[in-house]
Amino acid sequence: MDKENSDVSAAPADLKISNISVQVVSAQKKLPVRRPPLPGRRLPLPGRRPPQRPIGKAKPKKQSKKKVPFWNVQNKIILFTVFLFILAVIAWTLLWLYISKTESKDAFYFAGMFRITNIEFLPEYRQKESREFLSVSRTVQQVINLVYTTSAFSKFYEQSVVADVSSNNKGGLLVHFWIVFVMPRAKGHIFCEDCVAAILKDSIQTSIINRTSVGSLQGLAVDMDSVVLNAGLRSDYSSTIGSDKGCSQYFYAEHLSLHYPLEISAASGRLMCHFKLVAIVGYLIRLSIKSIQIEADNCVTDSLTIYDSLLPIRSSILYRICEPTRTLMSFVSTNNLMLVTFKSPHIRRLSGIRAYFEVIPEQKCENTVLVKDITGFEGKISSPYYPSYYPPKCKCTWKFQTSLSTLGIALKFYNYSITKKSMKGCEHGWWEINEHMYCGSYMDHQTIFRVPSPLVHIQLQCSSRLSDKPLLAEYGSYNISQPCPVGSFRCSSGLCVPQAQRCDGVNDCFDESDELFCVSPQPACNTSSFRQHGPLICDGFRDCENGRDEQNCTQSIPCNNRTFKCGNDICFRKQNAKCDGTVDCPDGSDEEGCTCSRSSSALHRIIGGTDTLEGGWPWQVSLHFVGSAYCGASVISREWLLSAAHCFHGNRLSDPTPWTAHLGMYVQGNAKFVSPVRRIVVHEYYNSQTFDYDIALLQLSIAWPETLKQLIQPICIPPTGQRVRSGEKCWVTGWGRRHEADNKGSLVLQQAEVELIDQTLCVSTYGIITSRMLCAGIMSGKRDACKGDSGGPLSCRRKSDGKWILTGIVSWGHGSGRPNFPGVYTRVSNFVPWIHKYVPSLL
Amino acid sequence: EMKKRVEDLHVGATVAPSSRRDFTFDLYRALASAAPSQSIFFSPVSISMSLAMLSLGAGSSTKMQILEGLGLNLQKSSEKELHRGFQQLLQELNQPRDGFQLSLGNALFTDLVVDLQDTFVSAMKTLYLADTFPTNFRDSAGAMKQINDYVAKQTKGKIVDLLKNLDSNAVVIMVNYIFFKAKWETSFNHKGTQEQDFYVTSETVVRVPMMSREDQYHYLLDRNLSCRVVGVPYQGNATALFILPSEGKMQQVENGLSEKTLRKWLKMFKKRQLELYLPKFSIEGSYQLEKVLPSLGISNVFTSHADLSGISNHSNIQVSEMVHKAVVEVDESGTRAAAATGTIFTFRSARLNSQRLVFNRPFLMFIVDNNILFLGKVNRP
């Protein structure tokens, strides 16, 4: 190589080095520490600014003495090596700086509030620039500084910022603030939310003697009970503190009976709004939402959140809305303030909210009623602020007195029921009625609760963490010795139905209690009272000896709401003709578009189960929570799965992001298709205490591809109200435990053949069975679903067309596989309209 | 409900005001360092009580040492309160309760030559419900039998052989015993109890009956000390805390024990569904406190420098032995059946990982109500 060439090649390299070393000034400081300069290595680089002093000193002499022989191959290699080395050192330093820099930037934000009792509110506090606001916020910041700089977290404490100082209904000042901690990400795990709050609470010195909750926090009189502190989001911090207020607004509502509109919408971009609402002292705020337009994904991206504070403090959330809605809903605060946050960070279609708020007086929820001596319903009681959602921590008392000692009090609820309290807590209202405890739960039908006493004292305490659905009940007196009229049957739901309707195959009680303990349901088969309609008529089961109930089912008759209508407007009596596997309409329209699987594979084959054959149950899904199998599910369409609600019960489990759905899988972990879960829809009446309404829909983030249709197939949803026959053989499948005492689930998909159990037997076994449940198993035990199978299918094969029907969803049981305790499943046929509401494409 | 109870606990606060010294935990560490690989079990509240009682008869520096050793720095007036506090506590503890067996008592055995001051005897009786017995220590076998029989009778046979041998030179022997057995709020299912391995060390394995119950427990993971803590409530006010140090971290946890740590745990408890595996065991600890307390600064009372003028005019008397014995039985029994109908129906979702807590290696145990009733280390159940 000649000299010129080597010069050319050396020059750009040199440039690079100096460029970088100039950019990273701080890097050089660290260099000697991390990597000492190379001692004694001769660096024959001519006339350059040396990156390091010892190297630079040696250079000029060598260069002048031996110019020509200097550029031999050996030296070039040395030069090149050194150059690479320096480059590596610099890159390493840069990387190190980058890492340490990003690490140190890991900040933790806490939003909190407390009430100061010995400072009165001044209107000036509303102005963030006012001297008064600055002075009071400085005091509070100093106090918080003192608390945390003397705590175990002092090393990480960065600062506190007072965001709002407001009046409130309890007197004194309500201070809202942020606390910021900064620590290396690696140490983030030692940071617990409770500890941060505990430090603040521990610093409040309360006096035991005067027994009030007000104590001294470094000289401030602070109400211990008012302290709330939760981890918050950086984005919330910057939008409530930072200069970029975006669509955020303050509202001061001073006038009663005035609607203050709250409307915002956008068709693109992003909306991250904080609306702070403050009413005059002594009043509350009611927010009425007319419509919300957001992406439905369980609030992962889009949400509307209503807080009972002025900062987004998690534990003061009154309600969250994660789906678009057009029904009017309203919510009431417990103080004179409210924060409404609306988030829609990536608007694709239209996002927005139409709402208004108003100032309302506080309501006392108590009443004393003298009930007249006529039996019947004569008045109504309701939850506080009806028809608004009622806020948590409410309390109502009602006293009733009838005029005769033979009359008791009856309460008729529209979509609610109260039952004896078990050892577990109540989720939707805690009732004390004449010193007995009950829990309330929402459901989809009426119930009547009777108290056989002329004097009734009722107390309702809200037990839900969030605001709860409005509640209305009619009250009246009833004859204690004869709650239902002569000739009528008293349902478990409390309703009274004519005796003639008992065991007629029609669920007149709504809870099916009129159809239990029947010899066998008998429609009136004789000519005179033969009912032309009803579930037993034309349901495919011959109930009458003369077979009359199954005659003339597809004969064309005038259309009404109890007939099935074919595509060519022909109507007939057989109501569940859609996708039942038999072509009934002359044009075949009743069997069109039925996409579910016509059992591809021939029947191949949990507790007492056997290994399945690969591909035998193509609708079976395994749901993984943070990487481990937790529940099962069934494929019902290209992007929807059906599972059990209890799989998603709880803070972490209800968030769709940690979940993945594994489809087309045989051995755990070897799925043909895996998709994250985009959205979880839990039935609104799901109740973890009563196991009722245990059903949930899951929307996949990615629809499974058509190319996998040999391995992944949807299972059919049963026709609405489909009757099942006890003794019918069905299959339960899953990767759950194979024995009750096992600790782990099975690796290979298991299957077990079980029998559908008569509902009466099911009810007498467990007692708490509702019409949303069914039992399946074998009475000897041994074959059953177990832990880990929940949400998975109970698949029954329909004889008429060989299609597989999703009759049940694995839900609960007493242990697993115990004799005389069959498994309990969610009865899917009760939820067909509910499923269609979210998955209309199924029909 | 339990959370409320946990919040109401003022550990060590009702009687002994919070102290500079941490008598309970210093005593624990002193006992632990004396016998590093052995189980430890004692009742801090019972020992404090017996020392406070002794202070009634002590004077000058002997008394100061006891009170300071207990972590108290008291004026005369508050000393009265201290004794009254213990009196109240004793009355509370001795009250018969359902499913709760607790025998706690003190007794002083003095040689025939010692004349006791009437005021001391009556104070012991009224404040500490304690008896004094003249004993002929020259007949050491007879004296030992007298003492052991007394304790056996008081504990209804639960503590026999309190003393294994007796020095015939003894003049004053202080005896302090406590037996405790209570029912859990919710019982463990007998069927769930199975023989399982317990790792005394990584090499030494013993088989123990391991009880198990899945339930909502108060639980926390202390990352600073590297241990897991679970609270299992007894019927009534008492709660047992079981502390499982991470492997190899027993020493670290022991060093970190303090009243503050305990308060922190009670505060940080969170309800959590757990599969708890706990050995069924009976643990007892028997200590000659005169050998341990001097390291906590309480020494004079056991030497010839003792000023026990409040007990007797007799010059040169000292407490020859101070014997403490604590016994606790842990088994499945509970007030509420674990498998009551209506509560055992369970959903069939899988369990999330890390929800099993197995006490199959040495662990620590507290039993607390308003005070620390017991503190111990179970090395070998």
Curated annotation (Swiss-Prot), chain A:
Residues 606-840 form the Peptidase S1 domain. Its EC number is 3.4.21.-. Expressed in brain, ovary, testis, salivary gland, trachea and lung. N-glycosylated. It is found in: Cell membrane. Keywords: Cell membrane, Disulfide bond, Glycoprotein, Hydrolase, Membrane, Protease, Repeat, Serine protease, Signal-anchor, Transmembrane, Transmembrane helix, Zymogen. GO terms for molecular function: serine-type endopeptidase activity; serine-type peptidase activity. Pfam families: CUB, Ldl_recept_a, SEA, Trypsin. Residues 98-843 are extracellular. The chain crosses the membrane at residues 77-97. InterPro entries: CUB_dom (IPR000859), LDL_receptor-like_sf (IPR036055), LDLR_class-A_CS (IPR023415), LDrepeatLR_classA_rpt (IPR002172), Peptidase_S1_PA (IPR009003), Peptidase_S1_PA_chymotrypsin (IPR043504), Peptidase_S1A (IPR001314), SEA_dom (IPR000082). GO terms for cellular component: plasma membrane. Its main location: membrane. It is a single-pass type II membrane protein. Residues 106-234 form the SEA domain. Residues 27-67 are annotated as: Disordered. Disulfide bonds join 247-273, 299-322, 365-396, 484-496, 491-509, 503-518, 525-544, 538-553, 559-571, 566-585, 579-594, 631-647, 730-796, 762-775. Serine protease which preferentially hydrolyzes peptides with Arg at the P1 position. Forms a heterodimer with SERPINA5. This is Transmembrane protease serine 7. It comes from Homo sapiens (Human).
